[in-house]
Amino acid sequence: AKYNLPVYITQGTLNGCRFNIREDLIRLLYSTQNISVGSLEITSFLKIHDASEPHSFVVSNGGTKVGVFTDIGAACEQLIFHFKQCHAAFLETNYDDDLLSKSAYPYFLKQRISGGRGHLSNKHALDLFINHRPSFMTHLLLSHLSKDNNNPELAHSLFSEHAGEVEIVVASRFVESEVYTIFEQVSEHSPF
């Protein structure tokens, strides 16, 4: 409420919310709903995660699309559909399988993280990237890396081997990412 900004939230997430949001700031969000904020259009869609009515988002401006895909248990059809349309994406690479298995985390937490409704591993995120990245993708920001169960250099190296022309960036948990110029590439067959 400090900035009096509207909060776009699903009913399920609102019901499970642990803090108070002023009623006049609440904007209920529904699956596959498009919301306009200035010149941006935001599309939301349901995803697999162990939360109440979780959604991911694609932010568009003109023909350029940026996906925000974090807190994902598995790459469902909805996620794949939207990922294939993105010029850039923030993609969860939460954990490395070996680091998680050797970590001090209790068994139940390891199962929650890796059990298909928790978080996306480096391997699963890489599979999504290799098999479904569009030819026009320019940037991939590896996001939501666990400080205990992943390593930024490891994740970057893994993706860089398969990146081609895509710039791979590890999003820091401590500082903002740089500003990138991302644009819709026009094919040589386009009349424009």
Model-derived features: positions:
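Cap/insert and terminal regions of metallo-dependent hydrolase folds
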Residues: 77-172
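Active-site HxH/HxHxD metal-binding segment of metal-dependent hydrolases
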Residues: 1-33
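Binuclear metal-dependent phosphoesterase catalytic core
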Residues: 158, 165-192
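Short active-site oxyanion
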Residues: 2-7, 65-66, 167
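Short, charged/polar "capping" segments at the starts of alpha-helices
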Residues: 13-19, 149-150, 176-179
